[in-house]
Swiss-Prot record:
This is Queuosine-tRNA galactosyltransferase. It comes from Danio rerio. Belongs to the glycosyltransferase 2 family. It catalyses: queuosine(34) in tRNA(Tyr) + UDP-alpha-D-galactose = O-5''-beta-D-galactosylqueuosine(34) in tRNA(Tyr) + UDP + H(+). Gene3D superfamilies: Spore Coat Polysaccharide Biosynthesis Protein SpsA, Chain A. It is found in: Cytoplasm.
Length: 338
């Protein structure tokens, strides 16, 4: 558990760890990343309660005025631990009593998996679309929807994995503020053939607040990582494809691709008659002469495979209905990138 100025939430967080119904051996490993609000001392005061329950507590940290970042703090907490399994916990979240038990069972049966869980959001209703997405992905979509702007298909504060798998994937990136260390680790795990699983119960109360480290990561940083991973994992396997969305997001994806993948784009497709009437998209920034012109078609006249650049859960089911009407299989005929 990395900690940075979390005194407002620590009592509730620590009480929940104490109430785990897991019967095996547990240890709590905390790294304090330079808190100035007494967080480290607060954790220290809980030590006797944990030791009474047979849970050893390891606390380390630094007093530097500049935090080293979430990735560094997580790595330090892991390095001082000794367990065969790692349960990641954010200091502002609250685990349900059965979390460690159920996720440990899943990780023991799947030692190369990152195991997540469903979450309950606090305050209720905050980030509604994101929370619905996290909790409703199918087992297949945990692997096919890894390219969307939502990030990892099981959220980092719910992660649980074997120590051996963590060590194989390698540590979290320690670039500090602004680095999506969870996404980088997640992608590396997938590259190595790792599984993604979710225990289908709400095992974590996931708190939304304006100080969360998530807010420090730039959208463009995430975009660049997603585009690179899409090109590496999907587009490298395709000879040609269609971008579903002739609007801003679709054109941005096209412009972000390497030239060899731009040349594979045979068309854009859309439902907007105005865009379709224009007939084509001209890539004005191209150094090629003549400049590339890509046809814009109605989706019914376009051919798969597709990269879909339309936001999920924003069209009242119209997008999903259109994809279904073409009898397409996600992960074969199309991938979401939105």
């Amino acid at each position: 558990m990395p900690v940075f100025n979390a005194s407002d939430w620590l009592d509730e967080c620590l009480q929940a760890i104490l109430e785990q119904d897991f019967q095996g051996r547990m240890e709590l490993c905390v790294f304090d990343d330079g808190s100035t609000d007494g967080s480290r001392e607060l954790v220290e005061r809980w030590r006797p309660k944990f030791e009474d329950r047979g849970i050893s507590v390891l606390i380390s940290g630094h007093k530097s005025s500049s935090p080293r970042g979430v990735g560094y703090a997580k790595n330090q907490a892991v390095s001082q631990s000794s367990g065969r399994f790692l349960c990641f916990q954010d200091a502002d979240d609250v685990m349900k009593p059965q979390r460690v038990r159920l996720q440990q069972e899943a990780a023991a049966a799947n030692p190369t998996a990152i195991v997540g869980c469903k979450v309950c959001r606090v305050p209720e209703g905050s980030t509604g679309r994101y929370t619905r997405w996290i909790n409703s992905l199918s087992a297949e979509q945990l692997l096919t929807q890894v390219y969307t702007s939502h990030g990892p298909t099981v959220i980092m504060p719910s992660w649980f994995c074997s120590r051996s798998w963590f060590e194989k994937v390698g540590q979290f990136h320690e670039g500090g503020k602004g680095v999506p260390e969870d996404l980088l680790f997640f992608y590396q795990s997938l590259r190595l053939g790792g599984l993604v699983l979710r225990v289908d119960e709400c095992l974590l109360v996931y708190r939304y607040h304006e100080h969360a480290a998530t807010h420090s990561v730039l959208e463009q940083t995430i975009w660049d990582l997603r585009v690179d991973f899409l090109q590496e994992r999907v587009l490298s396997q395709w000879d040609s494809f269609t971008i579903w969305n002739a609007g801003k997001q679709g054109r941005k994806l096209y412009r972000s691709l390497r030239p060899d993948n731009q040349s594979k784009v045979k068309a854009f497709c859309d439902v907007d008659e105005n865009k379709i009437k224009k007939g084509f998209y001209t890539y004005e920034e191209s150094k090629e002469r003549p400049k590339p012109k890509i046809p814009v078609l109605h989706f019914r006249n376009a051919s798969p495979p597709f990269i879909v650049c339309v936001k999920l859960d924003m069209t009242d089911g119209v997008l999903e209905g259109n994809l279904h009407s073409l009898q397409l299989t996600e992960g074969v005929h199309y991938y979401h990138f939105n």
